[in-house]
């Protein structure tokens, strides 16, 4: 199921057998939560998500072993495949022949080959995409905005986010490549609204992928997603969407159903009143995906939600992140952050590390730190 919301007409971008933007209906995306090298499980989840209504299924790759797995996954699934390059943009060259779209994060390009300029790296990505007949997504994220843009716009992360996306669009076009879409994500739905409105006003021609990153557990995560999606889709902003929910593997398809339900409601003029999440405790958690380094992450997020229920009237943010990609940067702005590794959880207060604890030990310490913040009047 998909729906045409054509108040804003972007250019059409072909992704495999489907089109994004232009006159095409809005496409729902999702992301596999299985380990990419677990080929049978990943193929099964690709098919599960496709059957639920996902027009594009994304897989994370971290190294050449993952690329080898994607080659076999491609052979076994009919899903339209996108890959997330994470921190190693060079993997694009070896994975491109087997996928339909590649997502790169502008804020991660500086991690390797620091002697090369960002324009050189973007030019290489454009040539790889062109040579292999694949589309690109420029995926800008609140927790990993490129350092030079943060320095250029001190105190205004939102403007840094938007300007980074605009610059990368211009770079792509300077290299003669325009088969790309853009995403501007934040865990705060109001910031998602502002960022996407600013970008759409500046580049009405570029297709936009919408997402509230780390929306968290349902039902709160669905509500946060609705806050942004209803207002943006109703004005024609958004060509593809994803509801990024924290869910166990066997329920991963529920984020597809949630996104489809929002689309259906907007199409039929049904808008649901939503609460203001700025007035009380806000728990954000990243969507379960193949980057998660311990499957206990989802259970921990649920335990954090239950443990902190007593503090729901306090205006605090607690972030629960499942991997090293999202963990460091996207817990920095939270009052309390939990960055989950393979065997330990790093507990943080803003950008300061409190300590590393086992999954069993971290909850009592979280309660202690939360009580201290409440007592201090935060």
Segments (PLM) and residue ranges:
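Catalytic alpha/beta core domains of metabolic enzymes, predominantly
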Residues: 141-144, 149-309, 320
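Glycine-rich phosphate-binding active-site loops on the catalytic face of alpha/beta enzymes
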Residues: 55, 98-115, 235-252, 340-353
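Glycine-enriched alpha-helix->loop->beta-strand junction motifs that scaffold or abut catalytic
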Residues: 76-79, 96-102, 130-132, 200-206, ...
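Beta-strand/loop-dominated core regions that host nucleotide or nucleotide-derived cofactor-binding catalytic loops
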Residues: 342-348, 352-375
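Active-site beta->alpha loop and helix N-cap motifs at the rims of alpha/beta catalytic domains
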Residues: 50, 54-168, 172-173, 189
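Short, acidic/polar
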Residues: 37-48, 87-93, 225-229
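Hydrophobic faces of well-ordered beta-strands that scaffold small-molecule active sites
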Residues: 26-32, 55-59, 79-85, 102-104, ...
């Amino acid at each position: 199921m998909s729906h045409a919301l054509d108040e804003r007409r972007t250019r059409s971008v072909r992704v495999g057998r489907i089109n994004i933007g232009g006159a095409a209906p809005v496409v729902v995306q999702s992301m596999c939560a299985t380990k990419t090298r677990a080929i049978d499980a990943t193929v099964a989840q690709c098919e599960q998500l496709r059957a639920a209504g996902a027009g594009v299924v994304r897989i994370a790759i971290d190294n050449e072993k993952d690329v080898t797995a994607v080659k076999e996954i491609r052979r076994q699934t009919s899903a339209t495949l996108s890959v997330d390059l994470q921190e190693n943009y060079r993997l694009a060259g070896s994975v491109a022949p087997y996928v339909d779209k590649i997502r790169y994060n502008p804020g991660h390009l500086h991690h390797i080959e620091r002697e090369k300029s960002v324009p050189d790296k973007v030019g290489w990505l454009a040539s790889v995409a062109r040579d292999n007949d694949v589309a690109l997504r420029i995926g800008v994220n609140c927790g990993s905005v490129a350092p030079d843009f943060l320095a250029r716009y001190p105190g205004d992360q939102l403007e840094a986010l938007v300007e980074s996306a605009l610059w990368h669009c211009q770079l792509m076009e300077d290299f003669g490549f325009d088969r790309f879409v853009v995403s501007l994500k934040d865990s705060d739905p109001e910031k998602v609204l502002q960022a996407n409105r600013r970008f759409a006003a500046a580049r009405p021609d570029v297709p936009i992928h919408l997402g509230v990153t780390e929306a968290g557990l349902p039902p709160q995560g669905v509500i946060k997603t609705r806050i942004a999606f209803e207002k943006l889709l109703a004005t024609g902003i958004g060509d593809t969407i994803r509801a990024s929910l924290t869910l166990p593997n066997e329920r991963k398809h529920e984020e597809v159903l949630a996104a489809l339900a929002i689309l259906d409601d907007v199409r039929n003029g049904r808008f649901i009143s939503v609460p203001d999440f700025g007035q009380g405790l806000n728990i954000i958690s990243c969507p379960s995906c193949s980057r998660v380094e311990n499957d206990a992450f989802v259970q921990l997020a649920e335990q954090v939600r239950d443990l902190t229920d007593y503090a729901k009237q306090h205006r605090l943010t607690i972030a629960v992140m499942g991997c090293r990609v999202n963990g460091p940067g996207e817990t920095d702005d939270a009052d309390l952050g939990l960055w989950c590794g393979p065997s330990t959880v790093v507990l943080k207060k803003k950008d300061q590390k409190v300590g590393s604890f086992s999954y069993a030990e971290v909850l009592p310490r979280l309660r202690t730190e939360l009580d201290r913040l409440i007592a201090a009047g935060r």
